A protein has these predicted regions:
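N-terminal secretory/targeting leader peptides
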Residues: 1-168
């Protein structure tokens, strides 16, 4: 309650933080470290352990709470004309290489995250894993407010929640 958390200038994100009792403050990403250092904010959201370690944010905090509420997708795109100019065999080769690269990238990302997590813990920061069910319940009003306004309908939210539950 009352934790000042760095937020994007997004009503959706601000409402999400408010729903769990936090005080969202819009802070530019480049000002995040200094804002933690000067106690303008108490927390940073939406960052990975890679960013936490690389940005040295762990130097300014005592705790990291693993909420897993953000997922940062990476995209590979190709010009449609270029794709269509490839033979079906070449398209198959490109798709296979992409699929293999995705698996490899995920493996490497998890390895780096584990290394960074260990380094952060070794620096004296306590990492806390939380049961996010309470947070998800608090977010229901946010889902209700934004469903249909950001390109996601109620059915999509239900499917995401079901997929998430299956992973637990």
């Amino acid at each position: 309650q009352g934790v000042r958390v760095r937020s994007h200038s997004s009503n959706l994100q601000s409402d999400s933080f408010a729903a769990i009792g936090a005080m969202p403050l819009s802070v530019a990403w480049g000002d995040t470290y200094t804002s933690l250092q000067q106690h303008t904010i108490d927390a940073v959201s939406g960052t990975t352990l890679t960013n936490m370690y690389g940005g040295k944010f762990y130097e300014q905090v005592k705790y990291i709470t693993m909420t897993n509420h953000h997922f940062i997708p990476s995209l590979v795109v190709m010009n449609e004309d270029l794709w269509n100019s490839l033979s079906s065999e070449d398209q198959e080769i490109v798709q296979k290489a992409f699929n293999e690269a995705v698996v490899y990238q995920r493996e490497i990302a998890f390895e780096y995250a584990e290394t960074y997590k260990n380094n952060i813990v070794d620096s004296g920061v306590e990492i806390i894993d939380v049961d996010t069910a309470e947070w998800a319940e608090a977010m229901s009003s946010v889902y209700d407010k934004y469903v249909g306004t950001v390109g996601i309908d109620a059915d999509m939210i239900t499917r995401i929640q079901e997929a998430e539950a299956a992973l637990q």
